[in-house]
Design a protein with these regions (language model features):
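A conserved beta-strand-loop-helix scaffold within acyl/acetyltransferase catalytic domains
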Residues: 26-110, 199-200, 228-230
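Conserved N-terminal entry element of GNAT/NAT acetyltransferase domains
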Residues: 1-33, 213-214
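Intrinsically disordered, low-complexity linear regions
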Residues: 118, 187, 222-223
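Short, flexible loop/turn elements at secondary-structure junctions
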Residues: 66, 119-122, 197
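Structured alpha-helical
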Residues: 74-76, 159, 207
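Accessory, usually C-terminal, subdomains that scaffold auxiliary metal cofactors
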Residues: 168-215
């Protein structure tokens, strides 16, 4: 059984109806069996889908688990405030410059967060992760999310009616010696994408998506979480 950690203090939200799932955070810098198990889940999903060997993980991982502790999805986050982002290897300029070029906005770097390591048992679980994460990142004070999206991932955003902006192609030539680890991943021609988190959040509210998915945040709307800024 793919069981997650059951520490009640890391529970961030409840979402879903059948079954109801809990979003939990695990800071990798703290180590422990919980983060190792989530890393293993991500590795297994990428290996099964692309024949890839995932070696890089975000500083903080989040997971969706049911009440029996069975893991249904996972994702990683990294703030742009203190370090370069994984996906910036694909860009010719800093991510905030590329967002400004594409969107017309001028975001502060510390208000940008990278999402990656997305792995789920099914497309429905991926959408639950996206919805729960949108609410959480708004509460953290982030304005823009950036990610490398395959057609499958982009379809999840489209199904949720969340707009995204292309920043450029995720060129496999930028991976250097690491390219051999990624199997068939780049065959799908992934793109570097950006999304305005607050506009996305407002869209989910107006469409009633949070209500339909029984989303229940376990943090105050104005409460800034610390885990994603490491």
């Amino acid at each position: 059984m793919e069981a997650g950690s059951r520490n009640c203090h890391d529970a961030l939200a409840r979402i879903g109806l059948d079954p109801a799932l809990t979003l939990r955070a695990l800071a990798r810098r703290q180590g422990g069996a919980g983060s190792a198990a989530v890393e293993a889940f991500i590795r297994e999903r990428f290996a099964a889908r692309y024949g890839a060997r995932v070696r890089h993980f975000m500083p903080t991982l989040l997971q969706l688990e049911d009440d029996a502790g069975v893991r249904h999805g996972a994702v990683g986050v990294r703030s742009a405030a203190r370090e370069s982002l994984f996906l910036e290897r694909y860009l010719d300029r800093p991510v905030e410059t590329e967002i400004a070029r594409t969107s017309g906005f001028s975001p502060a770097r510390e208000r940008i967060v990278e999402v990656g390591n997305l792995a789920a048992k099914g497309a429905g679980h991926a959408r639950l992760l996206i919805v729960a994460l949108t609410s959480l990142l708004v509460a953290q004070g982030f304005d823009w999310v950036v990610f490398t999206g395959t057609p499958e991932v982009l379809n999840s955003f489209s199904r949720l009616d969340l707009g995204t902006l292309p920043l450029g192609e995720a060129d496999p030539a930028r991976m250097g010696d690491e390219l051999a680890d990624w199997g068939s991943y780049y065959d799908s021609h992934p793109m570097v994408m950006a999304g305005n988190i607050r506009l996305g959040h407002e869209r989910l509210v107006s469409l009633g998506v949070y209500r339909q998915l029984a989303h229940q945040p376990l943090y105050a709307v104005t409460e800034r979480q610390d885990f994603a800024v490491a």
